[in-house]
Curated annotation (Swiss-Prot):
GO CC annotations, alphabetized: cytosol
Organism of origin: Methylobacillus flagellatus (strain ATCC 51484 / DSM 6875 / VKM B-1610 / KT)
InterPro entries listed in its UniProt record: AceGlu_kinase-like_sf (IPR036393), Asp/Glu/Uridylate_kinase (IPR001048), Uridylate_kinase (IPR011817), Uridylate_kinase_bac (IPR015963)
Family under the similarity heading: Belongs to the UMP kinase family.
Name of the protein this chain belongs to: Uridylate kinase
């Protein structure tokens, strides 16, 4: 068995990653494939925590949110992430992967409240911890939640799973000559305004020297390759 490059990781999954080819919602085949890839990493002995977004669900109600108070819309988005967290947990249960959902909003009937010490203990016991409801505060993205939770649980790296296999010099869909960065420094990413994470999350990770890896969750085996330290995606380093 190959030796992982990291002992504990924070995986940031966008809600859109769960849609597959659908326009919104949760695609069952897609979520099943994603949790199988997470299981491969857990089987390597890696401790895995997940922060999940809510765009796949919130997209369906976004037209109704136009003109809505920003804080109210953000709370709706947080609730969408809890729905995704429960869907992830259910998919994990089907393949024998033990997980716990912790929510930054108090919803005790469906999820534990976020408690840092408990989350770390679950990770040490080999359970996957799924963080829902972002930071629990409006005006902060789930990227920022990923950076924050990554620091709190002492993760060695934040893995941002996207639709693109890394960070490019330009949009690869529009410019076929766009080049993928293998590595970047935080300062380079900020100065060049590269779409790694939002500015708050990027600055948090830079200040705490927490590396980020950006990769495509749609490339079979990409998550495992990143964890093994192979040339996959883009790494953003202090």
């Amino acid at each position: 068995m190959s030796t992982p490059a990291y002992k504990r990781i924070l995986l940031k999954l966008s809600g859109e990653a769960l849609m597959g080819d659908d326009s919104y919602g949760i695609n069952r085949a897609t979520i099943s494939r994603i949790v199988e890839e997470i299981k491969e990493v857990v089987d390597l002995g890696v401790e895995v925590a997940v922060v999940i977004g809510g765009g796949n669900i919130f997209r369906g109600v976004a037209p109704a949110a136009e003109g809505m108070d920003r804080a109210t819309a953000d709370y709706m988005g947080m609730l969408a992430t809890v729905m995704n967290a429960l869907a992830l947990q259910d998919a994990m249960r089907h393949i024998g992967l033990v997980s716990r959902v912790q929510s930054a909003l108090n919803i005790e009937q469906v999820a534990e409240p976020y408690i840092r010490g408990k989350a770390i203990r679950y990770l040490e016991e080999g359970r996957v911890v799924i963080f829902g409801a972002g930071t629990g505060n409006p005006f902060f993205t789930t990227d920022t939640a990923a950076a924050l939770r990554g620091m709190e649980i002492n993760a060695e790296i934040v893995l941002k799973a996207t639709k693109v296999d890394g960070v490019y010099t330009d949009d690869p869909k529009r410019n076929p000559e766009a080049m993928r960065y293998k590595t970047l420094t935080f300062d380079e990413a900020i100065v060049k305004n590269l779409k790694v994470m939002d500015a708050t999350a990027l600055t948090l990770c830079r200040d705490q020297k927490l590396p980020i890896s950006v990769f495509s969750i749609f490339r079979q085996g990409a998550l495992k390759r990143v964890v093994l330290g192979e040339d996959e995606g883009t790494r953003v380093l202090p």
